[in-house]
């Protein structure tokens, strides 16, 4: 991106003028941001993201951040000699793995991001879905077709869960005190078992419960692409379902779009899939006329 020192004062004024109506639109609204992908491993990008979150809070927006951590979990498991298997895009999580997942997500990544935001002048609080029984989960189930027998079988994913209930008591208190919640995607069952939850799914459940103005899913790709690999800037739910059916939306993008649809059905006003590797992607989406990424709406 262009360095700020090369922008003329007049251009800087125009940028601020363009941002004003968007700031007014989001005044006192809640924005849930899922921060993930390999951009999390780049310190400069992570710190730029933290500054952007503080800017949102300073402009009377209520940001709630949910972070992932797949690459960092993989690195730690490899260091400890633990081999991971995946099924239907989800990490099969046994008893040994869930301990490492919780350590990396709730301990390392969460507190690092809290530190970056506080360093930038914000007041962030690091939590996971277990805190205050914020997010209850049920065991996730997936089916796969056996390549030899062609019979569909249920896959045991271990301690992988899906959100079942979100209690907003703690989140609403934090937002009311102008604190910035930073959430690791861990949850507990009603029996007290810890579950690893896909970060996109977790963010969608939280955004839906909060009836957020926007859910932003930061990923490693520019957004939803058409068959010629060009960005689709805007999609209705109906069109998104058509693109899944005809194979335009495929692979790992399918569960992301399904999360978007779920969040919209729960009351979120708009969901955007955008590239988290682009510095200030959140600001570009919220405060410019052209935005960035793919907006999905009803």
From Swiss-Prot:
The protein's annotated pathway: Amino-acid biosynthesis; L-arginine biosynthesis; N(2)-acetyl-L-ornithine from L-glutamate: step 2/4
Subcellular location: Cytoplasm
Catalytic activity: N-acetyl-L-glutamate + ATP = N-acetyl-L-glutamyl 5-phosphate + ADP
GO cellular component: cytoplasm
EC number: 2.7.2.8
CDD domains reported for this sequence: AAK_NAGK-C (cd04250)
Highest taxon in the source lineage: Bacteria
A GO molecular-function annotation: ATP binding
Endpoints of the signal sequence: none
Binding site for substrate: 69-70, 91, 196
Keywords for the protein's UniProt record, in alphabetical order: Amino-acid biosynthesis, Arginine biosynthesis, ATP-binding, Cytoplasm, Kinase, Nucleotide-binding, Transferase
Site label Transition state stabilizer, positions: 34, 256
SUPFAM superfamilies in alphabetical order: Carbamate kinase-like
Gene3D superfamilies: Acetylglutamate kinase-like
EC top class named in words: transferase
Protein's GO biological process: arginine biosynthetic process via ornithine; L-arginine biosynthetic process
Pfam families: AA_kinase
InterPro entries: AceGlu_kinase-like_sf (IPR036393), AcgluKinase_fam (IPR004662), ArgB (IPR037528), Asp/Glu/Uridylate_kinase (IPR001048), NAGK-C (IPR041727)
Function statement: Catalyzes the ATP-dependent phosphorylation of N-acetyl-L-glutamate.
Family to which this protein belongs: Belongs to the acetylglutamate kinase family. ArgB subfamily.
Name of the protein described by the UniProt record: Acetylglutamate kinase
Organism: Bradyrhizobium sp. (strain BTAi1 / ATCC BAA-1182)
